[in-house]
């Protein structure tokens, strides 16, 4: 696409953004609980709108070349991402589950399921800081040093005679197979001639034979033409894959090259812009700086004289903390200055009156407290009936960005800057403000001394110490106790290397979140209306990991604006891709991977003090080298109800207390995420596990839609020449594989598609029966195991709330039906 295309995309996005911002106030109004569905619908609409804006801003920021526009786009992109995370939090609070059925909203907005995909900003990987890249290189160097030299085993060689015998036997076997095939064909030919002779079949004349051949050939040719036309039509409407991918690949390659060339231009324009920033700053300081300095001095001297004429004394010069002379001369006249001074005098009088009023207020407060107690007792008796949206940190950022676009960029046309160069006028205005602020600080220091000299010379008065403004009384901000540094004399690099050598920091596999294959839930609203809690699909799990893990860890600004989530628990049977999701989060964000699994901690940092030191070092390095992911595999062992005898020597619970204490210290801006995975959560203490993990994601067996996509995508990913044909019934495979995990499906595909089978695909297409035998040898996830996990999940805090809400709905529905029956009678 051209530069103009991305400019139009940006303009259209702001039109949509303006409409969405107009809808925001309506969501802030409290809604009674009986209107839960309408409230959820409004939040869902906003959520989908912001998802679309996030997708557009991500594309525009990735391909926009003009450096000043990119800075504004970055702020808008982070703000919209923060708002998406806030609305996700609201949806969880309203739906009482992590899976949201938005199919009805999609239909009303005329969107497709693809619009539910959470876009991951490309700058997370493309604009990784030099520190992150240096850390990854350091990890690779340490691991290379630790890798033992692979000893080449001396394979026992064959003697010349044994080798000849082996080759001869293989060649004789090959010749025997060919001879047997040849003889089989000869016998078939003889058998056919014998049957013709026995049946007495008469020979055709030359004309009759020609007619028969023509009839057969024309029928065959017409069938081939019809089949070809049908295939072309099915390929055109997207029902069949196109066998010729050359044109499509060429188009994709051209688009990729265009994107890369624009990114190269971004780097060039950014370097030019940075160079221009320095030159503009120096130019303004040299040319306009002296005039600014003299003008400010004249203004401040005039203020001294006018204040002395009005009040009979020189004013107190404001200190730097309150803004210095900037606030005084922010478009103020001497008369306004006089009014400000009178206002200060009135404030002192008000203080006396306030003391008298305080006594009256105390009496009123006592009465109000009594009223509040009565109200609280009523509220306790009555359930909460109102839904409210929590205040947003992202909306002010989005509003500021939209206002800047409207005032600066909306009315400007690209024909002024066809080469996407920076706007020098806008740059000079920004730098002029910076130079003015720096010069004002210098002028304030000089004028304070001049004011001191004036007081001594005119009023014979020494400078009065200016009282610093008192802080308003109120509750003291709760200060967290600073954690004692147990390694003050150690550098971060040495601690990092120590953790790598011990095996607590590991290199993550290069897996993207899009590699976690799955399709969305299409009948969620139908299940919800039937008062059935829909189980999440693999698509929902992927989206939740993008929201809770990737978006928060990818950007410091997004993490600061979004609701704080410190830890995630992934619960599901073996083979569902829990570890793959952890590695995908690390890949998408460039995060460090710390492995605190109980099996990995065995024998490392023994003792109570050792466990404390271990957790301290891990969290210290994780905070200093953000972003970081702390993975706890088999996390049920850390929270065991009762440690099994065979695992007592491992002492899996030894870091539990220190881990919980360190996790509570994480605050907004600390891009550290704890992710636990477990297959047997029933063995863990429920309260401790749910208190530690703030978000619990249950991963059930894949449904039919996800299995269909899994079979299709995994088969196609086995090689460039692998294509699905009509001979392979993917739908049948998806039905047969009910109960099997993605790992089972991948194992069966890899067992069938060997190198030899891949070479035979041209002559012998794949059929479903080839996979069924390999799949049958694997043990599926039995329904009893999944039901056990579901029962555990419904005992979690969110699961209990959902079950209670569903029960209340069923009771209300039964009561309504009984009333209707009575009325009919």
UniProtKB/Swiss-Prot annotation:
ATP binds at residues 572-579. Gene3D superfamilies: 1.10.8.60, P-loop containing nucleotide triphosphate hydrolases. The keyword Kinase does not apply. GO terms for molecular function: ATP binding; ATP hydrolysis activity. Disulfide bonds: none annotated. Keywords: ATP-binding, Nucleotide-binding. Residues 344-378, 459-487 are annotated as: Disordered. Residues 467-482 have a biased composition (Basic residues). Belongs to the AAA ATPase family. This is IQ and AAA domain-containing protein 1-like. It comes from Mus musculus. The lineage of its organism: Eukaryota, Metazoa, Chordata, Craniata, Vertebrata.
